[in-house]
């Protein structure tokens, strides 16, 4: 029998034991801080509208639903957790499976483990500090450094991402030999994301985790726009050793503005020939009922474990990656 028979786990048993210890450590971290662990559905009748996320879709055909009901596997537990927050649950965290019909490789698996938590009455900076505490505890790393999105572009690409026009962004892309992609791209945010991925990410978080905060307002997603600078959103990401670990927001609480953003996403999807997605009315109703002022973050657990173990690939820390599922 082949030594690489696909019935065998992707990860070694010693690595899976270490993974279990890290999961227990994460739970202790939140238990010590009085944060409630919750569970929410893996499937929903609505899904994300973000043009860069691709959910799995299935169909329920049980009794009473002879015509079938479209369901989507959750790309993150965010919407359901916000409904719990609006219902008065207080600070919460969740370790759960999430699903994205996208990449597969060293740092990606279509099914993955997400750690997501929400802190009422925390601003973005206070939550960044808590993320830093968790990373130091699990990874035994140095305290993180922080750069604004604008500072990161100015340092590594010598361009201001908040004021540069598309011509200037394409010129910056040309210096990275990316003209073949950039010259035909008309969406400014896609150009910015290309430059960030190829021109900024390789240079940050090498020795210690790096927070990038205050993303452009056009990339706010579900984050508030900064009251100090309306060009930027109260959003942050965390990078370490070439890997994006987490994405956090000072959460938007305005139901009307959130609906407008969802609708704008769907217009962008239509313009790109992508299917428009059903908007989560339950989330909008929860925001209208009163989501407390809060900040939240989603962190990729498989990537965290990979870094903690010094592994080369997610396959080294996941029992069965999709090619063995």
UniProtKB/Swiss-Prot annotation:
<dbReference type="InterPro" id="IPR004364">
    <property type="entry name" value="Aa-tRNA-synt_II"/>
</dbReference>
<feature type="binding site">
    <location>
        <begin position="244"/>
        <end position="245"/>
    </location>
    <ligand>
        <name>ATP</name>
    </ligand>
</feature>
<feature type="binding site">
    <location>
        <position position="300"/>
    </location>
    <ligand>
        <name>ATP</name>
    </ligand>
</feature>
<keyword id="KW-0067">ATP-binding</keyword>
<comment type="function">
    <text>With EpmB is involved in the beta-lysylation step of the post-translational modification of translation elongation factor P (EF-P) on 'Lys-34'. Catalyzes the ATP-dependent activation of (R)-beta-lysine produced by EpmB, forming a lysyl-adenylate, from which the beta-lysyl moiety is then transferred to the epsilon-amino group of EF-P 'Lys-34'.</text>
</comment>
<feature type="binding site">
    <location>
        <begin position="76"/>
        <end position="78"/>
    </location>
    <ligand>
        <name>substrate</name>
    </ligand>
</feature>
<dbReference type="GO" id="GO:0016880">
    <property type="term" value="F:acid-ammonia (or amide) ligase activity"/>
</dbReference>
<dbReference type="InterPro" id="IPR004525">
    <property type="entry name" value="EpmA"/>
</dbReference>
<dbReference type="GO" id="GO:0000049">
    <property type="term" value="F:tRNA binding"/>
</dbReference>
<dbReference type="InterPro" id="IPR045864">
    <property type="entry name" value="aa-tRNA-synth_II/BPL/LPL"/>
</dbReference>
<dbReference type="InterPro" id="IPR006195">
    <property type="entry name" value="aa-tRNA-synth_II"/>
</dbReference>
<dbReference type="GO" id="GO:0004824">
    <property type="term" value="F:lysine-tRNA ligase activity"/>
</dbReference>
<dbReference type="GO" id="GO:0005524">
    <property type="term" value="F:ATP binding"/>
</dbReference>
<comment type="similarity">
    <text>Belongs to the class-II aminoacyl-tRNA synthetase family. EpmA subfamily.</text>
</comment>
<feature type="binding site">
    <location>
        <position position="251"/>
    </location>
    <ligand>
        <name>substrate</name>
    </ligand>
</feature>
<dbReference type="Pfam" id="PF00152">
    <property type="entry name" value="tRNA-synt_2"/>
</dbReference>
<dbReference type="GO" id="GO:0005829">
    <property type="term" value="C:cytosol"/>
</dbReference>
<feature type="binding site">
    <location>
        <begin position="100"/>
        <end position="102"/>
    </location>
    <ligand>
        <name>ATP</name>
    </ligand>
</feature>
<keyword id="KW-0547">Nucleotide-binding</keyword>
<keyword id="KW-0436">Ligase</keyword>
<dbReference type="InterPro" id="IPR018149">
    <property type="entry name" value="Lys-tRNA-synth_II_C"/>
</dbReference>
<dbReference type="GO" id="GO:0006430">
    <property type="term" value="P:lysyl-tRNA aminoacylation"/>
</dbReference>
<feature type="binding site">
    <location>
        <position position="109"/>
    </location>
    <ligand>
        <name>ATP</name>
    </ligand>
</feature>
<protein>
    <recommendedName>
        <fullName>Elongation factor P--(R)-beta-lysine ligase</fullName>
        <ecNumber>6.3.2.-</ecNumber>
    </recommendedName>
</protein>
<feature type="binding site">
    <location>
        <position position="118"/>
    </location>
    <ligand>
        <name>substrate</name>
    </ligand>
</feature>
<comment type="subunit">
    <text>Homodimer.</text>
</comment>
């Amino acid at each position: 029998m082949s030594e690489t028979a696909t019935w065998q786990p992707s990860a070694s048993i010693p690595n899976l034991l270490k993974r279990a210890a890290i999961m227990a450590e994460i739970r202790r971290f939140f238990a010590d801080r009085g944060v409630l662990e919750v569970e929410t559905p893996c499937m929903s009748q609505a899904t994300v509208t973000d043009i860069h996320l691709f959910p799995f879709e299935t169909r329920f055909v049980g009794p009473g639903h002879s015509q079938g009901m479209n369901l989507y596997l959750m790309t993150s537990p965010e919407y359901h957790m916000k409904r719990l927050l609006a219902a008065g649950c207080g600070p919460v965290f969740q370790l759960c499976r999430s699903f994205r019909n996208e990449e597969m490789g060293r740092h990606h698996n279509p099914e993955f483990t997400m750690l997501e938590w929400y802190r009422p009455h925390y601003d973005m900076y206070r939550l960044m500090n808590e993320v830093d505490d968790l990373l130091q505890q699990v990874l035994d790393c140095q305290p993180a450094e922080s750069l604004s999105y604008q500072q990161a572009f100015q340092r590594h690409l010598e361009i201001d991402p908040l004021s540069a026009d598309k011509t200037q962004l394409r010129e910056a892309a040309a210096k990275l030999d990316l003209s073949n992609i950039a010259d035909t791209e008309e969406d400014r945010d896609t150009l910015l994301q290309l430059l960030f991925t190829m021109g900024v990410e390789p240079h940050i978080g090498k020795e210690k985790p790096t927070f990038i905060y205050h993303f452009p307002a056009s990339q706010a997603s579900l984050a508030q726009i900064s009251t100090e600078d309306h060009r930027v959103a109260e959003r942050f990401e965390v990078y370490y050793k070439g890997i994006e670990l987490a994405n956090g927001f000072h959460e938007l609480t305005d139901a009307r503005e959130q609906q407008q953003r969802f609708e704008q996403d769907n217009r962008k999807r239509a313009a790109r020939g992508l299917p428009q997605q059903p908007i989560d009315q339950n989330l909008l109703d929860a925001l209208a009922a009163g989501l407390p002022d809060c900040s939240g973050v989603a962190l990729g657990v498989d990537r965290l474990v990979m870094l903690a173990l010094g592994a080369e690939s997610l396959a080294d820390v996941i029992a069965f990656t999709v090619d063995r599922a």
